[in-house]
C-alpha cells in the first residue's frame, strides 16, 4: 500500500515506515500529525483524488530537526571580477510515516 501526498508544495510517494525530509515544521520530536492532502492511495486498487481524496489521512511522527549540507551556487561571467559565490543550507524536519488510512 502506498500513497501520494503533498507537503510544502512538493509531492511524495510514501509507504508505512518511510522516512522523509520535509521543510522545517514547528513541531516537537516524537509529536504525531496528520497529512490530509492525499492525492492518491493504492491498496490493491488505485484511488485518485480531484485534487485530494476525502477521508484519506496519512499519519506521521516527527523524528528530529536539522540542517542539510551546504549547496554552493557559483555564477561567473567573462568580465573582470564578475563572479558571485553563495551558499545555502535548508532547514528540515525528519519524519516517519506511521499509518496510511484510506
From Swiss-Prot:
GO terms for molecular function: rRNA binding; structural constituent of ribosome. The keyword RNA-binding applies. It comes from the Bacteria. This is Large ribosomal subunit protein bL21. It holds the Pfam family Ribosomal_L21p. Belongs to the bacterial ribosomal protein bL21 family. Keywords: Ribonucleoprotein, Ribosomal protein, RNA-binding, rRNA-binding. The lineage of its organism: Bacteria, Pseudomonadati, Campylobacterota, Epsilonproteobacteria, Campylobacterales. Part of the 50S ribosomal subunit. Contacts protein L20. The keyword rRNA-binding applies. InterPro entries: bL21-like, bL21-like_sf, Ribosomal_bL21, Ribosomal_bL21_CS. One of its GO terms (cellular component) is ribosome. This protein binds to 23S rRNA in the presence of protein L20. GO terms for biological process: translation.
Amino acid at each position: 500500500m502506498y500513497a501520494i501526498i503533498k507537503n510544502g508544495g512538493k509531492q511524495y510517494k510514501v509507504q508505512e515506515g518511510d522516512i522523509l525530509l520535509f521543510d522545517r515544521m514547528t513541531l516537537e520530536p516524537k509529536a504525531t500529525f496528520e497529512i490530509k492532502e492525499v492525492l492518491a492511495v493504492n491498496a490493491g486498487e488505485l484511488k485518485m483524488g480531484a485534487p485530494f481524496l476525502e477521508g484519506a489521512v496519512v499519519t506521521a511522527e516527527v523524528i528530529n530537526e536539522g540542517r542539510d549540507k551546504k549547496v554552493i551556487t557559483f555564477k561567473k561571467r567573462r568580465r573582470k571580477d564578475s563572479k558571485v559565490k553563495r551558499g545555502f543550507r535548508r532547514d528540515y524536519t525528519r519524519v516517519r510515516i506511521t499509518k496510511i488510512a484510506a
